[in-house]
Amino acid sequence: MSDSINTEPSTDTQTNGERTVETTSPSAETTAGESEEQVRDEWRHYEFDGDTKLSVENLDVWYGDDHALKDVSMEIPENSVTALIGPSGCGKSTYLRCLNRMNDRIKAARIDGSVELEGTEIYDPNANLVELRKRIGMVFQSPNPFPKSIRENISYGPRKHGDINKGLLARLFGRDDTEQEGELVERSLKQAALWEEVSDRLDDNALGLSGGQQQRLCIARCLAVDPEVILMDEPASALDPIATSKIEDLVEELSKDYTVVIVTHNMQQAARISDQTAVFLTGGELVEYDDTDKIFENPESQRVEDYITGKFG
């Protein structure tokens, strides 16, 4: 933790299946150049029914000397869509990558704090990163299909993890490897709302698909290894309105079975598809986290209201 951080610790209580999360914003001394009024936000109070999937406590991230994320604490409920919004450079993508340790790949990155997946610390030195990234999948901003067939894009992950060879799919479907693979490909593409468009050309190169189809293929590829959490970093930012609408419909459908955390610059998109929204502002600070309707209709923080209404950012 940096000496520049001066916050009261977050509290977490649970009563009758309802979890309460409280956070306190940084003191005025922590935000050089901003007025006291800008940083004098009251603590946010967020309640949700059901179970917590991810729990983040006092998370800080530095890239060299740059303090990119400051003392973030929040809990993410399972089987829901959590949107992360904020201006460019506010730390929302950095935060997203912390949830499956993608920042570990950046040599200059230093991470302090705790992230738990169903009570298990993912930053434990003995954590299995391959297994972690199977449980918490990632879909990136730009579609990145493998230069292979559509079929191979889907089956690559399960084969790499040994699911097919170890007979996991045999137990699920009672068929040999070839039939298991076919079932897996069809199931994953149907989940990603792509099957009807590509079922007659599974052996075609995936690079021949449109941008929107490629992104849904990447989502299907993520689903093929049966994750519990799906992280999405602006998955529709490079797509046209029709393709974007399909991605949004897909995200809402996926939240019935998966926990989805999505970064978006599109506030209208966040309002349409998410159950709860976290607002990050310049300096890597989580300013407010609440039900999406509350964030967009009656935010507690004046800074969040100014951002939502376009007064800055």
UniProtKB/Swiss-Prot annotation:
Gene that this sequence comes from: pstB2
Gene3D superfamilies named in the record: P-loop containing nucleotide triphosphate hydrolases
Catalytic reaction list: phosphate(out) + ATP + H2O = ADP + 2 phosphate(in) + H(+)
Keyword DNA repair: no
Residue ranges, annotated region (Disordered): 1-40
Gene Ontology cellular-component annotations: plasma membrane
Gene Ontology biological process terms from the UniProt entry: phosphate ion transmembrane transport
Transmembrane domains' residue ranges: none
Membrane topology: Peripheral membrane protein
Cell membrane as UniProt keyword: yes
Family stated for the protein in its record: Belongs to the ABC transporter superfamily. Phosphate importer (TC 3.A.1.7) family.
InterPro entries on file: AAA+_ATPase, ABC_transporter-like_ATP-bd, ABC_transporter-like_CS, P-loop_NTPase, PstB-like
Biological role stated in the UniProt entry: Part of the ABC transporter complex PstSACB involved in phosphate import. Responsible for energy coupling to the transport system.
PANTHER family the UniProt entry points to: ABC TRANSPORTER I FAMILY MEMBER 17
ABC transporter domain ranges (all copies): 54-308
Compositionally biased spans, kind Polar residues: 1-33
Family matches, as NCBIfam families: 3a0107s01c2
Keywords for the protein's UniProt record, in alphabetical order: ATP-binding, Cell membrane, Membrane, Nucleotide-binding, Phosphate transport, Translocase, Transport
Highest taxon of the lineage: Archaea
Protein name from the UniProt record: Phosphate import ATP-binding protein PstB 2
Location in or out of the cell: Cell membrane
Pfam families: ABC_tran
